[in-house]
Amino acid sequence: MATVSVCMIVKDEESVIKRCLSCVHAFADEIIVADTGSRDQTVSICEEMGAKVFSFPWRDDFAAARNFAFDKAGKAYCMWLDADDVMSLAGREEFQNMKRELTDSADMVLLPYHTGFDEMGRPSITYYRERIMRNAAGFRFQGRVHEAVALSGSVVKGTAVIEHRKERKGDSFRNLRIYQDMERRNEEFLPRDLYYYGRELYFHERYEEAEKVFQRFLQAFLRDREGWKENKIDAARQLAVCCYGLGQEEEALLALLQSFVYDMPRGEICCDLGRHFLDRGRYREAVFWYEQAL
């Protein structure tokens, strides 16, 4: 059976950390916690529950903190979790079964991640994340914000579901501040960084700046063919909203149509196009695009 080090970065998570660690005790062979400056009881709770806790001075870099935690791991595989992640009993059982079948031939395991839930508690947003990496393969996180590991080697999909159950709101300006600091320092922006930087500007209704960043992201894709296609489609859609906010209606329409370069038309984009023509009294064109969404 494969051995797994569960690796986490935490700060002031006393309200949720015990819930998370109670889940992972079922399958973790080692728990590594990188604490970035907790002032509550997080560290003592982690230690009481058998985790190895290491101090990591925070420097606005999530990838660096994740990599620090991975560097402390001693088992065959490293698995990352957030403090407000949980697993159901069924998910834990599926994970145990996966451990029995996991061999050294697998470099990376993708697991489903539920990050949004409807009013009935049912998952409304689910996608796969790179969750488990072979320790000796030297995988590294990239990105000061929205850190991720590039897929490589032998990649397999598992079925054990991780649920992200956030209980408190974080600092809504934190990510934006980090990206702006990267700009001031002239740090390199990877395509993924540009996408999420544009989103942060968009969410804060800084449309003119967001438009420029989304354009940089989409131009980088056309030049280098890098980036996840769903991010490109979403960037084109949010670019359109920025253009509307700036009174650039034709540019907004072109942004929506640009999404078709990346993949088959998405229903959401077709609805956006329908709304564009409906708002301008061009009903036949609106009907056409709404029908495409069906």
Q: Model regions: which residues?
A:
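N-proximal low-complexity "stem/linker" segments adjacent to membrane-targeting elements
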Residues: M1-C23
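A conserved acidic beta->alpha catalytic loop
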Residues: C23, D35-E47, W58, D82
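Tetratricopeptide repeat
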Residues: H25, F173-L176, Q180, E211, ...
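Conserved donor nucleotide-binding strand/loop of the catalytic core
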Residues: V43-F68, K72
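Catalytic-site signature of metal-activated, phosphate-bearing donor transferases
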Residues: A64-F70, A76, M87-K212, R216, ...
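Start-of-helix register in tetratricopeptide repeats
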Residues: R192, G227-D234, E268
